[in-house]
Design a protein with these regions (language model features):
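NTP/phosphate- and nucleic-acid-binding module
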Residues: 1-482
Length: 482
């Protein structure tokens, strides 16, 4: 079963929506299991940000035109587009990536992120790339505006936010008052953003509506270089793929934070701290370490105002490496722009603060989790699909099965379900179908333990508990369930 069929069948992700009207690409519904998993992802992000004294805020989704002029999005927030001879449109970088993968080549061998439109076109011509359905491409690349426009009141031009960050910066004066006019401090928000993508695809990996979890930490320029880092942070290692190693076609390396600072791989201690936090967060999802890397932006790929930028990438089974987060040193660019356009003073402690940003895509994390932890295996000539979720993100700790719905077994199952629900928030009861079918159903959604209530349960208060991963069953006392 392919990953998209699996997600649809098991109530993770449905769409494109609205399905009854044939759907619009780039818009999806999270079903009950999908929403539960997404909440787990967001809870891990929320917990880690909050533990690091980065506090949650919520800002508007829509802002007037002047905001996006100041931020630099208006007219400049674009993707390269190319048309085929029948008028079909294609996002250039993704077209090239798909071509390379199809031809057993890796996009990692080419600095696609640093190419301009002229270089893209030359690459397409040299490689004789065609559209996905084999049509010739026109020899022109144009920039497609990603901003989604709307109106406020009768005729005031406004736009949906294309990321949460800009709207998070705008209340800076209020933050500064709230934090008693002392730097550094941090805020984050988890919310929707919108981009008018040329060709949304691969489920929630590239949608027109998506969720971001972005933290913004404000420092003075001096603080950025001087903040204290404890021994645990300095000794911790991160899987890094520097732009130098990329250009020399070398693999990622595990390097300690301390070494990164000594070798000037990281340009400030504040940035090192942000990278450490991003690495700590991603480790909580239980991804195998070989599937994680931080890829540094090439100098000609990086935004002109950024001091440093790294993408946190996960290697999936269906899409190879995908970006799930970005860690950026944005210097004082954003607040400087908004100070200039608004004519409001956004200084703190005598200068405009610099911003460290950790920007996670929660939809991409959900997709990566399902893609990596969904396994298909043969068991006694039968196909078993099992979602081997790590404990930190498991949807259900227990599923309770009555062997029959009669003779008091259903009532006993409901009693045990109720007892377990007092201790845990992820216990379900499943009463339909054979026990074997119920095992398979729970395996598919990652339930860790299945508990069967049978006639012996009524006699001696014991149950059969079966482990998801090993399928081993054992008999234990109800009081020993944990």
């Amino acid at each position: 079963m392919d990953i998209h069929s699996y997600m649809k069948k098991n109530g993770f992700i449905w769409g494109p929506e609205p399905e009854i009207y044939d759907g619009v690409a780039g818009f999806y519904t999270y079903g009950p299991n999908g929403k539960k998993l997404k909440n787990k992802v967001e809870d891990i992000l929320r917990k880690n940000f909050t533990k690091n004294s980065i506090h949650e805020v919520e800002t508007p989704i829509i802002a007037p035109e002047i905001v996006w002029k100041a931020s630099g999005h208006l007219g400049k927030f674009t993707d390269p587009l190319i048309k085929d001879i029948k008028g079909g449109v294609h996002r250039v970088d993704k077209l090239i990536e798909d071509f390379l993968i199809k031809n057993n080549d890796s996009p990692d061998n080419y600095n696609l992120g640093s190419m301009n439109n002229k270089e893209f076109l030359k690459f397409i011509i040299d490689k004789k790339i065609k559209s996905p359905n084999g049509l010739e491409l026109k020899k022109e690349i144009i920039n497609h505006d990603l901003m989604m426009e709307t109106k406020v009141s009768v005729d005031r031009r406004a736009f949906n936010r294309p990321e949460t960050a800009t709207m998070t910066y705008l209340p800076f004066k209020s933050y500064y008052e709230f934090y008693r006019k002392k730097l550094p401090f941090g805020v984050f928000q988890i919310g929707k953003a919108f981009r008018n993508e040329i060709s949304p695809r691969n489920s929630v990996l590239r949608g027109r509506e998506f969720t971001q979890a972005e933290a913004q930490i404000f420092y003075s320029e001096d603080q950025k270089k001087e903040i204290e880092l404890n021994k645990d942070i300095l000794k911790s290692e991160i899987p890094l793929w520097s732009h130098k190693d990329q250009s020399e076609r070398k693999l990622k390396k595990n390097i300690s934070i301390e070494s990164c600072l000594k070798k000037s791989i990281f340009k400030s201690r504040a940035f090192a701290k942000a990278m450490h936090l991003a690495n700590k967060i991603i480790s909580e999802f239980g991804f195998p370490i070989e599937r994680i890397r931080f890829r540094q932006h090439n100098p000609n790929e990086m935004a002109f105002y950024a001091e440093d930028a790294w993408d946190l990438e996960i290697k999936t089974n269906s899409q190879s490496w995908i970006e799930v987060a970005g860690i950026h040193d944005r210097k004082d660019y954003d607040l400087s722009q908004h100070q200039k356009m608004s004519n409001k003073n956004l200084e703190a402690e005598g200068s405009i603060p610099h911003i460290m940003e950790l920007a996670f895509g929660t939809d991409r994390l959900v997709y990566s989790i399902l893609d990596i932890f969904m396994n298909q295996e043969k068991v006694n000539n039968d196909n078993r699909i099992v979602l081997k979720l790590p404990s930190s993100i498991q949807l259900n700790k227990f599923a309770v099965f009555p062997l029959q719905k009669k003779d008091g077994l259903l009532e006993k199952a409901q009693e045990i379900h109720s007892i377990l629900n007092e201790k845990y928030d992820n216990v379900i009861i499943d009463i339909s179908g054979s026990i074997g079918k119920r095992y398979r159903r729970q395996d598919e959604i990652g339930t860790k333990n299945c508990i069967t209530i049978d006639y012996d349960t009524l006699k001696d208060n014991t149950v059969t508990i079966r482990d998801r991963d090993t399928m081993v069953q054992k008999r234990i006392k109800i009081k020993d369930l944990k």
